[in-house]
Amino acid sequence: MVRSMPLRGGRPQAPTAPTRWQLQNTVFAAESQNQPSASEAVVSSTRDAALQRRRALTTDGKAATLVQGSVGGGRVRSARDQRQPGWVRRDKGATSGVPFNLSRSSLPITNRQHPLTDTAANARLRAYEQEVKGRFDRIVPLLQRVSALQHEPDFIEQAQRLTRAELGFDLPQHILERAWVRPLDMRALFAWCVFESHRLFSDRFFQDDPLDGAAGSVAARDFEQFLLDCGIHLLDVSPCADGRLAHTVAYALRIPFSAVRRRSHAGAMFDVENTVNRWVKTEHRRHREGMPNPSTEPTRYLKVVTYHFSSLDPQHQGCAAHGSNDELAAAAGHQRLLDFREAVENSFCCGASVDLLLIGLDTDTDAIRVHPPSRDSEMVLDQWLCARELHAATASMTADQAMAQIAEAIEAGASGPMEPGMVAFLTRLIANNCSQIDYVQDLHGAPYPDAGHAERFIGVGIGFKEVHLRNLTYFAHLDTVEEGAPDLDVGVKIFKGLNVSRDLPIPVVVRFDYSGRVPGARERAIADCQRVNQAIADRYGELVNQGLLHTCLTVRDRNQTAPAEVVGSTLAPPLQEAH
C-alpha cells in the first residue's frame, strides 16, 4: 500500500480531507496576489507587535525585548511586564531546584467563588455524590449493628428491617438463616451490600440520568456541536485506572459523559492496537453514515491521556503504576500518544492522522494542568498551564475577562502556533475545571480528605459507563485476565491495603457490555463473564478460598438505556441437587 505523506510543514489529515498545509497554502496563494494597503500594513504590524509581547511573556525566565515599539498604540513592555506568568511552566533548566511537579502551588485556599463557576451544576453534582457514596459509607456501621443482633430470636426480621431502612435493599436470606449454627458470615454480607449498592446507583444512573449527560440530552448535543466547531469529530479520553480519576470526565472536566469515549487503564497506558481499531470504526462510520460528520470535513480524532499526581504527598500518593513518579507518568503517557499517532500514520494512506493532548490531574484538588499542543500536536513535557493558578489569577475578573485571559495564556504556553479550535477547546476545559476547583473547596473546605485510595470495589471487564465518582471504583478494563493482569494486580494490591488489612473482602464487579443488535451477543457476554470469573478464582485462589474476594457478574446492552443485569455471583445460594 502506498502511503500518502504530508508535505513539509503540514500535518496529515483525515483520509479524504485536504491537509491543513494545503488549505493554508491555498489561502496564502490567494492573498499574495493582492498587495496590502497602508491600513492593512498597520493592522499586520500591530498584530506582529502583539505576538512579540505575547512571546515576551513566555520566554524561559529571560526578559524578551521587542524588535520595535507597537504601532497600534501599545507600549514596549518593561522588565517588570516581561516576567513569565505564573501559570506558564517552562523547562527545568530555567527553574533550577524546583521539583518537576510545579503544579504543587502554595496558593492559599480562598473562599471566593470564581466568576466561571457553575454553582447550580456544583449543587446537583454534590447531591448525587453524597447520595451514592453515602450508601457505601453506611455499610460498615449497619453491619456492625446487624452483627450484634445475630443471637436475637427475631434476628432475621430485625436485620432485614434495618438494612431496608439504611441501604434500601434486603440481605441474602440464605446467609442470615445460617446464623444459628455458625457465626454470621460478615465478609459475605459486606460484599453483598457493596454489590447491591452498585446495582442501585447503576439502575438510577441509566433510568434518571442524574448527571444530565445521557445521549440526546441538551448538554450532550451542545457539547458535540462545540467539538465539531473546534474541528474535533471524536473525543477519546484514557485516564489512569486509579479510582481518584474515575470522575475525570463528568466532574473534573465537566464533559457530558455520552459525548466522550472513555476507557481507563493503569498508568493511562491504553492499548494502542485497540485504540487504532476504534479509530477505524469512527472513520468508517463517517464514510458510511456521515456521523458525527461527513469524512470530507477537515475535523480530527482527538486522543487524550490523563495522568495524575499528588500536590500534598507526591512521593507516596502519585500514580502507583509509575511508582509515584510524576515525570515518568507524564512521559509514559506522552509516548503512548506518539505511538498511537505513528500506528495510524503507518497503517493508513491519504494523510491519515490524529490530534493528541496530554492532561495532568492533581488528585488532591482536582486542578488540571494542560500541555498545550502546537498545530502539529507537539507538546513539551515540562511546559504546561496550571488551572489552579489561572483560577487564582482570574478570580477577580468578570467571566468574559477570565475567558479571554485563559485563552491568551493557552496560546502563550504552547511550543508553537496552535489551531484556533484547540485553543477554544482547552479554554473551555480550564473554565470548566474552575467549577470543580470551587466544588472541592466548598465541599471539603480544603483539599480532599482522602488523599490516597478509598475505592469501594474493583470493576473488571468492558463497560461501567455509570461510574463517574471519585474514589468509587478501580477500573481494570480487559477482555481476558491474562492480558489485563497488570491492571488487575494493581487493583488487588490496592484493596489488600483498603479491605483485606481490615479483614474485609475485595468486591469485584465483572461487566461485559454487548450489542443487542447482534444475534447471540448476550450469551457471549455471559460466557465472557464466567470465563473471567474463573480466571480470577484461579489467579487469586487463596483470597477466594478465605472468603476475601467475591465477584458479581453483570452484562448490559449498550444500545439501550436499561441498567446492567446480574447474571451470577459467588454469593448466590447453592443449588440443591435433585435425586
Swiss-Prot record:
Q: Per the annotation, which location comes first and is thus the protein's main one? A: other
Q: Where does Zn(2+) bind?
A: C240, H308, C319
The enzyme's E.C. designation: 4.2.1.1
Matching entries from Gene3D superfamilies are given as: Carboxysome Shell Carbonic Anhydrase, C-terminal domain (3.30.1330.140), Carboxysome Shell Carbonic Anhydrase, N-terminal helical domain (1.20.120.1310)
The active site consists of: D242 (proton acceptor)
Bias regions of kind Basic and acidic residues — which residues?
78-93
Q: Which UniProt keywords apply?
A: Bacterial microcompartment, Carbon dioxide fixation, Carboxysome, Lyase, Metal-binding, Photosynthesis, Zinc
One GO BP:
carbon fixation
Localization, UniProt: Carboxysome
Q: What induces this one?
A: Carbonic anhydrase activity of nitrate- and urea-grown cells decreases with rising temperature (from 25 to 28 degrees Celsius, present versus predicted future ocean temperatures); there is probably more than one carbonic anhydrase in this cyanobacteria.
What is an example of a GO molecular function annotated in this UniProt entry?
A: metal ion binding
Q: Annotated region Disordered: where?
A: 72-95
How is the cofactor bound, as the UniProt entry phrases it?
Binds 1 Zn(2+) per monomer.
Q: How is its activity regulated?
A: Inhibited by dithiothreitol, partially inhibited by acetatzolamide and cyanide.
**InterPro entries hit by this protein:** Carboxysome_shell_carb_anhy (IPR014074), CsoSCA_C (IPR048620), CsoSCA_C_sf (IPR043066), CsoSCA_cat (IPR048539), CsoSCA_N (IPR048619), CsoSCA_N_sf (IPR043065)
Could you list the residue ranges forming a coiled coil in this record? none
Known catalytic reactions: hydrogencarbonate + H(+) = CO2 + H2O
Cellular compartments per GO CC: carboxysome
Described by its record, this protein's role is as follows: Reversible hydration of carbon dioxide. Essential for photosynthetic carbon dioxide fixation, supplies CO(2) to RuBisCO (ribulose bisphosphate carboxylase, cbbL-cbbS) in the carboxysome.
Listed under subunit, the entry gives: Homodimer.
Please give the name of this protein: Carboxysome shell carbonic anhydrase
State the species of origin: Parasynechococcus marenigrum (strain WH8102)
